[in-house]
Amino acid sequence: MVASLLPSRFRGRESMNQQHPLRSGNRALTSTLQFLSKTACLHPIHTVCTIAILASTTYVGLLKDSFFHGPANVDKAEWGSLVEGSRSLITGPQNGWKWQSFDGDADVLGDFNHQALMTLVFPGSYGVASQAASPFLAPLPVNLSVIDLPSTSSPLTAYSKDKVFAFSVEYSSAPELVAAVQEIPNNSADLKLQETQLIEMERQMWIMKAARAHTKRSLAQWVHDTWTESLDLIKSAQTLDVVVMVLGYISMHLTFVSLFLSMKKLGSKVWLATSVLLSSTFAFLLGLDVAIRLGVPMSMRLLSEGLPFLVVIVGFEKSITLTRAVLSYAVQHRKPQKIQSDQGSVTAIAESTINYAVRSAIREKGYNIVCHYVVEILLLVIGAVLGIQGGLQHFCVLAALILFFDCLLLFTFYTAILSIKLEVNRLKRHINMRYALEDEGLSQRTAESVATSNDAQDSARTYLFGNDMKGSSVPKFKFWMVVGFLIVNLVNIGSTLFQASSSGSLSSISSWTESLSGSAIKPPLEPFKVAGSGLDELLFQARGRGQSTMVTVLAPIKYELEYPSIHRGTSQLHEYGVGGKMVGSLLTSLEDPVLSKWVFVALALSVALNSYLFKAARLGIKDPNLPSHPVDPVELDQAESFNAAQNQTPQIQSSLQAPQTRVFTPTTTDSDSDASLVLIKASLKVTKRAEGKTATSELPVSRTQIELDNLLKQNTISELNDEDVVALSLRGKVPGYALEKSLKDCTRAVKVRRSIISRTPATAELTSMLEHSKLPYENYAWERVLGACCENVIGYMPVPVGVAGPIVIDGKSYFIPMATTEGVLVASASRGSKAINLGGGAVTVLTGDGMTRGPCVKFDVLERAGAAKIWLDSDVGQTVMKEAFNSTSRFARLQSMRTTIAGTHLYIRFKTTTGDAMGMNMISKGVEHALNVMATEAGFSDMNIITLSGNYCTDKKPSALNWIDGRGKGIVAEAIIPANVVRDVLKSDVDSMVQLNISKNLIGSAMAGSVGGFNAQAANLAAAIFIATGQDPAQVVESANCITLMNNLRGSLQISVSMPSIEVGTLGGGTILEPQGAMLDMLGVRGSHPTTPGENARQLARIIGSAVLAGELSLCAALAAGHLVKAHMAHNRSAPASSAPSRSVSPSGGTRTVPVPNNALRPSAAATDRARR
């Protein structure tokens, strides 16, 4: 319990996955915090605005109360007020003629010569005027004896340039002197110039600041006074105190820097750190307002000295802890989460990401955070109760109030900010994914659909900024939120500054500081800093006379060059001109009770309207890209019909085929219905829409061709029944590729297309069985396939998906999904994974990351091709092409270019990074633009672009260039298998496997002239994972480039695979489909990486390399032990000899001679016919 109260930096960071059961003592507190945070998160914008307005009103109230109702100036031009805070010193033969502090009654020292040492300070900002000021210019009483003393300088005297006069006078006569020097004539050289001014009715004089009437000065005057008082405070303070304060302010600013750096590590450069500072500022304002209302005396000096140390001691650790927990749980919630229902079944969590993250973070960290606040507040309360002197008692009360409000705002205001941050992160991920998919060539509608489905789970599907937001919405929201807050505060301050007081004068900021210091303790006086030289002079005189002396050193008395009318507090409204009068009159008119009520009603209506607009924004806007009308008839006329081999329309009834014998399959197909029912109601088929509504009625095909043409002209294709659509398509009236758009139902379009292909006369002999075949087509998200993955869809091909593993890769366990129809492959990979795990797991290294595209350009002569190559290889060419290429996408970045010449043909190999997308379409767009810039701006207008892909990439083909230079991700994976694991799990030995690898993978592949094929079955594993995770299967050609190496390392088997060209992506292409996306979710690499673009794709490449490592290990062990054929026979065949044809085993450990039929080598009938012609 005691350890939990310590800050986390003293206890070490705990795991996010470590769940602590809630004790009965903190369950109620946690529930309360979760309720407050949930309320704030449900309406974050309203919460932020409400608290911001409340805090703004609080400090404006502080200013107004101080301006208009604050007490009068504490300092008075009276002896009783000036002598407060003075210090008395005594010297004489009894103490060796040394100054000694004396705090007793002066009457006790009857034989002492009691002197009052006074210091008059005239500001140096008035130039020559201060030189003419002298206290002896004032009319002094005749019996008053004044001794002139040397002034005392300080290190800041050169900067302030103040004129200081020091003198001593009998203590009993000091009040008369104070009354005489309240006003001192100004005999400067500028006096004649002042007398010539006609407007001037009185002469300026040096007036004691404390003698002025309580008038409200301007902002410039307040700044000047504050600066002067700060310099005086520094001059009178001890050097050690100044050093401590400087260190305190430096530490405070370092704490601010640490806050920004910590938030930057969490993914926020400015936003969250600024919000934390804003929350703390609001807490300070609320605490200060409550403290003043409770009667706690405050002063600007006390605040300026105490706040830096409060910031350093308390810090922002609690806000950082809560932020880290919320963001971490938000990332966890993006993965599929499961909960156990009351009935024991597993159901998906419907809670939104924001609510889940905040609730879980508060459940884990909320109690500890509140405990830290409570401990800190208790310590401050104890300090206040103990009565610490020197103003610290008052500051302890203020600090306790600040921490209380800081705790309250942390779970309301700041959690609302965090909810907005999470929504901004979701919006950024959504927009970045959508842009990346659009760069990959997907339509905007498909990209939006995929990006929406990849958002975090949200049952309500309501967002703070609406459903249709652009990438510029996030910075616009931040900008206008900050601007709005600043405008509100500036208006509040401006209204306060220009609001007229009861006497008609303008407000003064100095009144606030004076009211805060109304009952504060004055700072202790340092006599030797104030009048060190004067004390030395008095000591010298007392020693010479041999008389004991007592000196009372007063605080410096400051003067200002003012008009004598300052005593009357005259209005200075004319200094502000007509504008100030107009603003003051306007603000005064608002004090009218009727007008103020109307203003309140208008404000209420504004709040209600804004609430309505916020609600409307949350509902979002419908996607305007959804099709609202059928395909243009002009496009229909130009489209190619399905029945291109026959012009006349076949009879629909004659196209029906006899139903096949029904066989049940795991997936619903048309053959699942009764055979006789299919035959009887083939023309009465009822098609169901995706929305569950009936699309067609059970009407026989009785319309004539003329009626169908008339209906077609009316653009009512979607209202026709299936048989009518088939008839129109067979006549070429409805193009097959446009069925989805025409019917507005993807599943129905796939079904109709199957019927059309089955009834096409040109291929009816082969395709007649397709309409009622076992190829499934229902219950599939065809909307994602449309315009993205496949065209002319007739169904989907289910492939078994197994999982190999688990396998430990770089210290983390994975199950590897593999889509394959080859038996033993998954089991073999699992056996290899087990052996790797027993050896400590696989270790991977990323050696390269860059997708390539190699266009071909041609010039008329070789010299121009050579010049282009030299320019492209130069720094200038590289820079120009990089700028042109990078301007086409926010994700693709050109790394390098490699060029080669063949005659007048120039081949350029662009190598780029593409984030988490595989990026071929993205690169093609960038290459095209870069080549256009090269032709138009680089002086190669005679360049002829032959093709964007000149096979110099090289894509989907074996290539030594890919093997040497790499393409996509380059991965090296290694594992060390102990000898006993090789013996017990792999049933082999280390030396046998090393020798097998040399003979098979190295020498055997070299003898075959292989390029990148120095492995046993890398393509097997790569293809299975490619298909399961939505990769391009054709790119297995180069992705399976691999060399397997084995070595006997101190008795253990060291195995590694090097794969320089794994071409994968976790965004776009087949990864947008839900089944493939689910497999990526199982690996934790779906979509784009939240913080490091491209990291998900690189991690997928590491997983593939490690899976290949497991497969290589297991297969080589089986080959070394001679178990391969036996394993395949056991897993793939029910009996050793089967009449059913079996697929070939690849690779095989043994060889069997199969007799070849005599007619197998004969040419086909078509080949014989071509030979005759």
UniProtKB/Swiss-Prot annotation:
Residues 241-420 form the SSD domain. Residues 1133-1148 have a biased composition (Low complexity). Glycans are attached at residues 143, 186, 886, 997, 1132. It catalyses: (R)-mevalonate + 2 NADP(+) + CoA = (3S)-3-hydroxy-3-methylglutaryl-CoA + 2 NADPH + 2 H(+). PROSITE patterns: HMG_COA_REDUCTASE_1, HMG_COA_REDUCTASE_2, HMG_COA_REDUCTASE_3, HMG_COA_REDUCTASE_4, SSD. Pfam families: HMG-CoA_red, HPIH, Sterol-sensing. Its EC number is 1.1.1.34. This is 3-hydroxy-3-methylglutaryl coenzyme A reductase mlcD. Pathway: Polyketide biosynthesis. Residues 647-666 have a biased composition (Polar residues). The keyword Cell membrane does not apply. Residues 498-673 are annotated as: Linker. Compactin (also known as mevastatin or ML-236B) and the intermediary metabolites Ml-236C and ML-236A are inhibitors of HMG-CoA reductase involved in cholesterogenesis. Their hypocholesterolemic activity might be useful for lowering cholesterol levels in the blood and reduce artherosclerosis and coronary heart disease. The gene is mlcD.
